[in-house]
Amino acid sequence: YDGRGKSLSEFEDYDDVAAQKILGRSLISSELGCYLSHYGCAKKFLETDADYLVVLEDDIQVLPNFKQKLNSLISYLDQHKELEWYVVNLAAKKKKLAKDIVQIDGYTIWHAYYFPIRGVGLVWSRAGAEAFVELGKTMQVPVDIFFQSWLSKNGKGLGVWQPFVQPAGIDSDILGTVATQGIKRKALENRSASHGFKKQKRMWRDRFYAIRNLLS
């Protein structure tokens, strides 16, 4: 879903008051478009009888042995239903507040208690997609922040290390055409004076949830 160039009022499920309260800023249209793309993928997945959904953003680099590793990952998860996971992050930049589950096929699967912010490659379970569709309809934060906060709180996120995919290294067009017009992102986001404080508050809250789940 390409949200670039659209006004915020065109997104009927966007709550700008909540965004300002949580983030201290507004979302920009391309962030909302990205959110809707992920949400739409989850909804379409639930209309099928598939057990798992792989979501890859279009600006990624697929790392060596991707298909082999992905197949072994899904095979392992399919044989270990007791993990009761929602989402696997395939693109973690680093491991934070994590607990290893198993090493197979040259990589490690781990409990991502502090769920990685980089959401360019994900694997969904049906339970995870159902929960996202139910809880995530109203857009209040960028989708990667939603995933990090939600999965750090419920402890149902997993990760792989080394990552299977990574950003391609090209500049994201998250600002769309306005980037070429010299409009600063800060102004576009309508940041309040509390933006920095709220960012730190959110980070420490999510880390608290992660530590609690790690120690439980």
Q: Can you describe what each PLM-predicted range is?
A:
Residues Y1-L56, I60-S216:
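An acidic/histidine-cluster motif and surrounding catalytic segment
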